[in-house]
Amino acid sequence: MSNLKNWDLFCRIVDNFGDIGVCWRLAKQLHVEHDLQIRLLIDDLEAAQVIIPNLNFSENHQVCDEISITKWDEKTDFSEAAEVVIETFACGLPPVYLAAMVRQKSKWVNLEYLSAEPWVEDFHTKPSPQANGLTRYFYFPGFTEATGGLIRERSIAFSNQQDKPKNTLKISLFCYQQAPIHDLFTALQSNHHGVFVYVPASSILPKIANFFGVGSIDVGDYLSRQNLHVHVLPFLSQADYDALLCDCDLNFVRGEDSWVRAIWAGKPFIWQPYFQDENVHIKKLDAFLDLFYAKFEKKEVVCEAHRYWTEGHMPNHFWQSYIDNLLVIQTFIFQQKNQLAKQADLASKLVVFCNKI
């Protein structure tokens, strides 16, 4: 139970989905499981509506699912600060609000992006004293006990039984535009059994349309070629997307939010990190693969798949090698999911930390 009940979370939306996806899950969990009063300040309400369907982006102040949501712009009233302020992903706080934080003596935490890189453990919870007298703490989510953990609600179901293999293959596809979709679909159409690909609507639809030789595609469209069957879904709510991940045999995910949810689904997944200059994203990918699959006998098969997918080309031999090992991959990921679930979750660790500093 938290002694500090009044929290503000600041969210600046960068890629429309990842930042607000993480912030919305965290805000809801802090309120529901820790009985906190949460205000979520968002710079782009229209983009946020994709993740929060009942959000009215024309209203500057509103309540959705018992979370207070405020439009963050130059007109926002920042005269009062919360007891705890979460600056997500180094989004930067308004000077007027920082002054209010000094008066309130707010606890200030910068929630960083998730990473499996080894240096994260060394910098997690490090203080950074500021000239205004406040201390800014860096909080790093991660995969080990020495980090801030992963977002995981109590409502996530965990089972001791894996799904049995089926003749048909169900795949969810959520990726950035750089992904080699043409290469993937070329391999899938020649699969020995039927492959059903479910695509939540996003910026990759033109590439899918190009593969099938049509001008454009839209939500509800169903396209087939040989053994490949593609169904375009609407952009799903977080609950519906989580259910899709659990229902599929293989999930292609991207960024941060869908990546973590793929792990909790306990199914084989291929992750595409957010692209960064100087191949920083490749370093993050390699760090995750080295940590998560360290004890996996088929590590190279999985690592090869991730690297091909992220680098934008996928040789034909990759697909058959991956599918041949799909069952053993599923078994390993299922075990990893259950191991990670033994650690404290991010929200719980964050509440403890903020009440301690």
Report residues per predicted region.
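Active-site and donor-binding regions of nucleotide-sugar-utilizing enzymes
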Residues: 11-35, 39-133, 202
